[in-house]
Amino acid sequence: MAAPAGGGGSAVSVLAPNGRRHTVKVTPSTVLLQVLEDTCRRQDFNPSEYDLKFQRTVLDLSLQWRFANLPNNAKLEMVPVSRSREGPENIVRIAFQLDDGSRLQDAFCSRQTLWELLSHFAQTRERLQQLGEKTPVCVYMRNEVTGRAALQNTTLQSLGLTGGSATIRFVIKQCDTAGKQESIAVRSKAPGSPVSSLSADQASSSTLLPLNSGEFSRGDLNHEGDANTSGTGLEGGPKPTDAQTKQSTSEPASAPFVPFSGGGQRLGGPSASLRPLTSPSANSSKSFSGPGGPSKPKKPKPGEEPQQEPEPPVDRDPVVYHPDLEDLLQPWPAEVPDEFFEVTVDDVRRRLAQLKSERKRLEEAPLVTKAFREAQMKEKLERYPKVALRVLFPDRYILQGFFRPSETVGDLRDFVRSHLGNPELSFYLFIAPPKMVLDDHTLTLFQANLFPAALVHFGAEEPTGLYLEPGLLEHTVSPSTADVLVARCMSRASGSPPLLPAPDPVSLESEPIAEDGALGPPEPIQGTAQPVKRSLGKVPKWLKLPASKR
């Protein structure tokens, strides 16, 4: 009996008809037919007379291990084949795709090698005769067959092609060094594969390896070859030559790194210009230099985070405006008919749908972490670097100013006090609805929900006639002018929705705290002079509306 599989990788256990179990190591690119052939070769059976069965399912032997949907250490069983695989079922239709996009198609036997298939077509045969220092490569799915020796020893059946149709990509690439190819060959050999019987010289010039992606990329193969070359050097394998060592040591010496107090990498200079010239092999050799694996960058401690520079003060741009100074677009209707206030079935349905959507949003809201909430807050702060605040006085005058989100409620009080006619007046600020007095002067405007724009009410313990200074009241503007100033001064991030529309006198509605229509007269409702009577439709028996007319 074969020895059990050890080490890394996947393995499969096959039960032979004689009652013996054989363990086969597999890779993601191993074809199930190779597992069957390896077991039959060990137990002296004919592979064409048996199939592999997993539980109650007979497996498709043309599938690779990654597509067979089998667990690791799966227990397979050899069962007699229901129909012989000899005969017309072994005919496979192959299409070779060339570099120019053209395809060469024909039917072949599954026992034929890839070299015989390439020699069958005149176009590919001419390319094989004019190779020179180049190497022919055939790519099927994630398997790559490189070199003449591998093409002559790889059959369609070894690739899992025992019937149907398939497309194989044929390319000509430059020859790599023998050391790189040898390292790739050592990594790419799979147990039980048909290329395992090749000699060391043949393996150095031809390889059969699985690709990491479905797309053929020469750069990826070179990078993997460099990484494996450096990895084998640690185990006593072929070491780089003296010329390569001198070249790798001379490159960093020519551009010394000069640190600076800011941390990070220096921009510009000789080090930045020579950085793209560093070979991937040098990077891979550095990653394997430590005994414990590649080194990880150190994470800064919470106490060592760089302190942010204080933000420059923002221009307040104080402006006073009055809602009565705005010219109405249309005259208000003299009287609204009673039908306008009637609650119809459509109104109830619309309101019910809104309540359902709001309840669903609150119930299905995901639980977020503290770090996620802080990231959202930081994103909001970066999107709106300024805060537009408007203070509504009892005499309907509105004072507008700009602040930073990090400024406090105390700064807002100082701003209001500096524009009062009587600076000694005792007052308080609050937001509504619901009424909430801003008595904590240490809260930032962001923490007080005055972000990115809000309307704050002014309250005084001793009411007076005029609150603002007379010099400021002489320059009172219209609400539309104040809105234009907000749209001009508040810088927004690119792609974010506009905070305040310039021509529209409607006040800020970006936050729930801001009152609708409090900062300017609302637009008249279109068509209220001649209301359209809405049909009640069919009213359910359980719905009773006191104001509805039937």
UniProtKB/Swiss-Prot annotation:
PROSITE patterns (alphabetical)? UBX
Which positions, given as ranges, span the membrane? Answer: none
Q: Which tissue types show expression of this protein?
A: Ubiquitous.
Q: Positions of the region Interaction with GLUT4?
A: 313-376
Q: Where is this region: Disordered?
A: 185-320, 496-550
Its placement in the membrane is given as: Peripheral membrane protein
Give residue numbers for the modification (Phosphoserine): 193, 496
Where found, per UniProt? Endomembrane system; Endoplasmic reticulum-Golgi intermediate compartment membrane; Cytoplasm; Nucleus
List, as start-end ranges, the regions of compositional bias called Basic and acidic residues.
217-226
Q: Does the keyword Chloroplast apply?
A: no
Tell me where in this chain the UBX domain is found.
Answer: 382-458
Extent of Low complexity compositional bias: 193-206
Q: Which GO terms describe its cellular component?
A: cytoplasmic side of plasma membrane; cytoplasmic vesicle membrane; cytosol; endomembrane system; endoplasmic reticulum-Golgi intermediate compartment membrane; nucleoplasm; perinuclear region of cytoplasm; vesicle membrane
Q: Which domain of life is it from?
A: Eukaryota
Report the InterPro entries cross-referenced here: TUG-UBL1, Ubiquitin-like_domsf, UBX_dom
Question: Polar residues: which segments have biased composition?
Answer: 242-252
- What are the GO BP annotations of this UniProt entry? glucose homeostasis; intracellular protein transport; regulation of D-glucose import
Q: Which residues carry this modification: N-acetylalanine?
A: 2
The protein's UniProt keywords, in alphabetical order, are:
Acetylation, Cytoplasm, Membrane, Nucleus, Phosphoprotein
- Main location as per UniProt: membrane
Q: Give the protein's biological function.
A: Enhances VCP methylation catalyzed by VCPKMT. Tethering protein that sequesters GLUT4-containing vesicles in the cytoplasm in the absence of insulin. Modulates the amount of GLUT4 that is available at the cell surface.
Oligomer status and interactors:
Interacts with VCP. Interacts with VCPKMT. Interacts with GLUT4.
Q: What is this protein called?
A: Tether containing UBX domain for GLUT4
Q: State the species of origin.
A: Mus musculus (Mouse)
